Each structure stands twice: as C-alpha cells, then as structure tokens.
Amino acid sequence: MTGCSPVFTMQQVVGVSHRLVWRTFRGTDLLMTRTLCSPGPSRPGEKRPEAAALGLYHRLPELGRTLSHTIRNQAASTAKAWWDRYEEFVGLNEVREAQGNVTEAEKVFMVARGLVREAREDLEAQQTKLKEVRDRLDRVSREDNQYLELATLEHRMLQEEKRLRIAYLRAEDSEREKFSLFSAAVRESHEKERTRAERTKNWSLIGSVLGALIGVAGSTYVNRVRLQELKALLLEAQKGPVSLQEAIREQASSYSLQQKDLQNLMVDLRGLVHVGQDQGSGSPTGPSSPRGKDIDGLSAAMKEQLNHSRQVYSCLEGLREQLDSLEKTCSQMAGVVRLAKVPAHPGMVEPLDGALPSSLLEHGSTMLALSEMEQRLEAQANRNAISSTLVTCVTFMATLPLLYMLFKTS
C-alpha cells in the first residue's frame, strides 16, 4: 500500500505549548505548531472565588447556630423582663421577699433553739455533778483533809453553774427574741400575701367591669349600625317604587298623547279618503291633484306614528315586567312588616303561607307599613340605647361602693 496516511499526535507538557503534529510514516512534519500561554502566577494575598465561596459555605452552619442562639437569648431576656414587670405589678416580688425573710428568720430561730438546748444540757450536767459533790461532802467528816478539797470543788462548781445558768438565761432571751422576729416575719408574709390577693381581686373586678362596659358599648354600637343599615334599606325601598311610578306615569301620558294624535290622524285620513272618492266619481280620468301627495305624506306619517307606538308599547311591556318584580319585592317587604307587627299586636296574626291580600300590594299601604316599620325601628333603637345606658350607669354606681370598700380595706 502506497501513499501517506496521516497520524495525529498531541504532546502536552506542563508549562510548554501544545503542538498538534501531522506526521507521515517517513517521520516528516507537515503541520504547523500552535502555542498557548499558561496562566500567570497568582498573588500571594489574593483568594480565589471558589475558596471564598467554600469557606462561606462551611461557615454558614456556625453563623446559623450563632444567630439562633442570639435570637433565643434575646427572646428569653425580653420574656423575663416582661415577667418581672408583671410580678412587680401584681406584688409577687414582695411576697417572695417576705417568704425569704420568713425562711431566714426560721433558720435563726432554729439555731437559737439549738443553743438553748445545749445550754440546758450543760446546766443539767453541771447540776448533776454538783449534787454528787455535795453528797460526797455530806459523807465526809469536817475534820478530814478531803473536806477542804470537796468544799473548794463545790465552790468552783457553783461558780460554773452560775455561769451556765446565766448563759442559759441569755440563750432563752435570744430564743424569745428570734421567735418574735420569726412571728413578725410570718405575719408580714401573710399580710403581703393577703395584700396581693386583694390587689389581684380588685384588678380582676375592675377588668370584669371594664369588659362588661366595653361589651355593652360594642353591642350598642353594633345594634345601632344594623338599625341604620336596615333604615337605609327601607329608605331605598321607599324611593324605588316612587321613581318607577313616575316613569310609568310619564310613559302613560306620552302614550295617551300619541293615541290622541293617532286618532286625529285617522279622522283626517278618513275625511281625505271620502273627499278623494267623491272627486274620483266626479272626474275619473282627470290628472292627479295635490290631494294625492297629501295622502302619501299622511300615510308616511301614520306609518311613522305606528312604529313609534310599537316602540312605546315595547317600553311599556318592559316597565310592566319591572313593575311585576317590584310588586313581588313589595309583597316580601309587606310580609316582613307583618312579621314585625306580630309581637306588638298578637291579635292581628294571619297566615302568611298563602297569597297576601291585594291591599298590601298597593302603594299607599306599602308606604304606610314601611313608615310604621321605620318608626318602630327608631323607637327600638332609642329603647336599646336608653336601656344600655341605664345598665351601664347602674353597674358603675353599684361597683363604686364595692371598690371603695376594697381599696379602703387594702
């Protein structure tokens, strides 16, 4: 096989250019060399973006833990501050301080009791020893040399007994003093506890009274708003039929005028037709007179009037539908009025399941019922306002003496 078959080789050396060589079997280079520059050395103080991002990624958990710890400490400190304010306002700090004083006084009293017990035991032991010495002294003769030693020992033991008795009496006085301090601390603690209970009861009573007043005021406001909305609906219901009836009257008056014009036109047309027939019988072959043009004009006017009458009729049909819907609404309102009249007039109760009487659908009776309903609602609103005001005043006047007595006792 003859000819040159190309072989591609890539030589890559660090810091040396890349060369793409096209060699033949004879080893002759046939392709040019392309040199590439290696990246320069980086600065010693400069950080790569990858390293910075990796360091930030590793620091994120620690930052999250630090932030959560800071937030938790801040929330705990805020809650503790508010709780301390609440305890100071209620009086728990004073009660806790009084209980601490009671505990300290109890410890001091118990120490004093221990000292008294030890002094009594020492005095009793000294008295026992003194009794033994006296017994021995009674059994020994006064001429004996041991009598002087026993007398000296008795004298020394009497002095020791006197010292122990004085110490015992002082311990008893100290015990009584510590007991009085302990009793005073207990009484103070009980007084602080009773004061805190009274203060809590007073504030709870004041809060309940204020809550009742706020509830009464809120219910009064809500009732007033509802009554105003219902009054506005009644006013809208009153204004609706009046405007619609005025529109119906206007359309009816225009329709009656158009009917009169149409009747006059028909009368004129009949007269013209009779005149034309008379002229046709007198001169059947004569040329058309100006009367023919008048007849054409009148026929065109009549067609226009008929079209206008049809439009008016369609408008009246639409108004009739609206009037039907309005009558249904008025019937519903009349039913509501009758239901409202039931508590005031028990003898006027009638069945509402069937069709309402025709008199309730009339405009005058409906307007009268709506006006009565409006007056009844206004009277009810006034009664509710007066009753709520009276209840508030009576409650306030009843709580004033109680609050005065509570604060006076506290």
From Swiss-Prot:
Residues 276-296 are annotated as: Disordered. Residues 223-385 are mitochondrial intermembrane. Channel activity inhibited by ATP via ABCB8/MITOSUR subunit. Residues 280-290 have a biased composition (Low complexity). It is a multi-pass membrane protein. The keyword Transit peptide applies. GO terms for molecular function: mitochondrial ATP-gated potassium channel activity. One of its GO terms (biological process) is cell volume homeostasis. It is found in: Mitochondrion inner membrane. Its main location: mitochondrion. The keyword Disulfide bond does not apply. It catalyses: K(+)(in) = K(+)(out). Keywords: Coiled coil, Ion channel, Ion transport, Membrane, Mitochondrion, Mitochondrion inner membrane, Potassium, Potassium channel, Potassium transport, Transit peptide, Transmembrane, Transmembrane helix, Transport. Residues 116-143 form a coiled coil. Residues 1-35 form a transit peptide. One of its GO terms (cellular component) is mitochondrial inner membrane. The mitochondrial potassium channel (mitoK(ATP)) forms a heteromultimer. Pore-forming subunit of the mitochondrial ATP-gated potassium channel (mitoK(ATP)). Together with ATP-binding subunit ABCB8/MITOSUR of the mitoK(ATP) channel, mediates ATP-dependent K(+) currents across the mitochondrial inner membrane. An increase in ATP intracellular levels closes the channel, inhibiting K(+) transport, whereas a decrease in ATP levels enhances K(+) uptake in the mitochondrial matrix. May contribute to the homeostatic control of cellular metabolism under stress conditions by regulating the mitochondrial matrix volume. PANTHER family: COILED-COIL DOMAIN-CONTAINING PROTEIN 51, MITOCHONDRIAL POTASSIUM CHANNEL. This is Mitochondrial potassium channel. It comes from Rattus norvegicus (Rat).
